[in-house]
Amino acid sequence: MKNLIYQYWDGDTSRPGVIAGVKAMKKYAEKIGAEYLFEDNPRYYTHLGPYSPHYGQFKLIHEEKFSDYDHIMFADTDVFPVEKLEKSIFDDLTADIGICAEGWMTKNKGKTPAESYNPICRDADEVWAAKLEQRFGVKFPRCEETNHLMMYNSGMVVYNNKGLKEAKQKFMQYEDYIRTISPCASFYTCDQPYLHAQLIIKDINWQ
């Protein structure tokens, strides 16, 4: 198996948090026999507004040099492996793309901007999802306990080779996605809601 852990940072890479995160993830890659790649200021996207740096994680979908890996994990530099972890993250992937649910946020996010202390709230989530459901004829997953929309975190995403290829073929153009959800709050134009949406509307095999 040819596996890769990929990280990047657009900005000041001398920040202690970046240095620590990269060091820890590189060590973990060595433990599980995976290749490791950190890119210093690749600035892959620069035309998507303030969230351009966030979309850099999708470089691994589009660039040919990543296409021959069996598995790739993207992780933000503030993601740390559990201390002394020996098990490979790739062993637990049973679908084509793996992503983590935002369990606490799904259940506890405020309903309104006043309750959330910012524009990212359950009411705004509903507007965002409704725009995509109306256009694509899909239903977004909901928490069985609260019926709130499920939220997913794009800070760590695992792909197998099929998942990489399907993402390249099926994912919306970023500009089209941003137009579709307009005029949602700016957060909904970033990589996390974008990836969440693609997994649902493009019928990807994900977990």
Model-based region annotation:
Residues 58, 123-143:
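Short acidic (Asp/Glu) patches
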Residues 63-65, 88-92, 146-149, 197-198:
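A general structural signal for short secondary-structure junctions and capping/turn motifs
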Residues 1-70, 162:
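N-terminal anchoring/stem segment of glycosyltransferases
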Residues 135-207:
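Catalytic core and acceptor-binding pocket of nucleotide-sugar-dependent glycosyltransferases
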Residues 46-75, 80-88, 97-102, 152:
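A conserved donor-nucleotide-binding helix/loop in the catalytic core
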Residues 5, 36-39, 73-76, 98-100, ...:
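A structural signal for short, well-ordered beta-strand segments and their strand-loop junctions
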Residues 81-130:
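Conserved donor-nucleotide/metal-binding helix-loop-beta segment in metal-dependent transferases, i.e.
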Residues 10-12, 43-44, 79-80, 104-106, ...:
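Short, solvent-exposed loop/turn segments at secondary-structure junctions
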